[in-house]
Amino acid sequence: MQFDESDARVWIWFEIRREDDIVELLWQSGQVVGTNQTHRQSYDPPPILRGSGSGRGEENAPLSQPPPHLHQQNLFIQEGEMYSWLHHSYRQNYFCSELLNSTPATHPQSSISLAPRQTIATRRAENFMNFSWLRGNIFTGGRVDEAGPSFSVVRESMQVGSNTTPPSSSATESCVIPATEGTASRVSGTLAAHDLGRKGKAVAVEAAGTPSSGVCKAETEPVQIQPATESKLKAREETHGTEEARGSTSRKRSRTAEMHNLAERRRREKINEKMKTLQQLIPRCNKSTKVSTLDDAIEYVKSLQSQIQGMMSPMMNAGNTQQFMPHMAMDMNRPPPFIPFPGTSFPMPAQMAGVGPSYPAPRYPFPNIQTFDPSRVRLPSPQPNPVSNQPQFPAYMNPYSQFAGPHQLQQPPPPPFQGQTTSQLSSGQASSSKEPEDQENQPTA
């Protein structure tokens, strides 16, 4: 590979993995000069003035500039060293073997250029409190150098830790950085510091890529800080509201409990009144507990039920007893009839002369006694006769017959004695016919 001075500049870009710097090698009058691409164009930003709201009379005083950054010294390589380095074999694995492209022999080129990597601008937010150059006073002016594009820093003029906020705290200053050659993208950063009272400072940096302009401008809105009295009032109102809600729920619960207790008390009073009435109805009930009183009531009801069942059994046969009830009152005081038997001797009147006046004994005609003929006796039929079931002797009545069972009442009574009734009738007729004859035969005085 041969290089002539008449050829154009040969730009050889390569990346060194050390501190993220880019070094540019230039061919100038037979020598290779290495310069840092980051600090190729140095510029001095305009002085940043303090805000008008500081109140210390330093409205137009510029901020103090930080000490200039120490640039790396240019790397000078002698011509002999450059020649040995360029004509070295590519077979060895050097750190730049992957960066340099091999040129074909048939088509030599006058210049070789390696395009740098294009970084994609991304929107990100970083906290610059982690860097050492921001640990000091944030109001000190200075130029912020980065490995790639430059940043514009905007600061507010306020004092750290101050309790008073200046009236123009929301206004911020902006700096304009002119565009430089060879840069494809610009990144403008905005540093905004808000006054947060006693809680300290919050620093936020927003980096955004702008394609063609290098102007950065920050506009911040004032933070509305509520006083302590308002926060206390709100806290009291919230606590008061919660207490009222709790009080309302507790009142409702107490009210429902009172209603339940009142209903329970009324129910118990009614039960006690009913138990007292039950004790009065049950004889010899002196129990104090409700269970014992109920047991006595159950026993008493059972006894009454058994008595009623015993009284209802004769009432079922009341239709049969009513048929002979009128005959029971007839001839109840009549003595049994006197039946004279034949062959009996009566006392003579002579034997009773000393006792009283003698009266002739009445002569009773006796009917002819017929011999007993069993053929004339009629036997009762085997079928029961409902008329024969009725008693034929109303003069003799068993007083316990009404309590007898139905099977006892259905027994047939003994057959009547027919000879006795006929003799009574004949004797009655004879006595009535002899009375006038006796009156005629009596002597007259």
Curated annotation (Swiss-Prot):
This is Putative transcription factor bHLH056. The lineage of its organism: Eukaryota, Viridiplantae, Streptophyta, Embryophyta, Tracheophyta. GO terms for molecular function: DNA binding; DNA-binding transcription factor activity; protein dimerization activity. One of its GO terms (cellular component) is nucleus. PANTHER family: TRANSCRIPTION FACTOR BHLH119-RELATED, TRANSCRIPTION FACTOR PIF1-RELATED. InterPro entries: bHLH_ALC-like_plant (IPR031066), bHLH_dom (IPR011598), HLH_DNA-bd_sf (IPR036638), PIF1-like_bHLH (IPR047265). Transmembrane segments: none annotated. The keyword rRNA processing does not apply. GO terms for biological process: regulation of DNA-templated transcription. Its main location: nucleus. The keyword DNA-binding applies. It is found in: Nucleus.
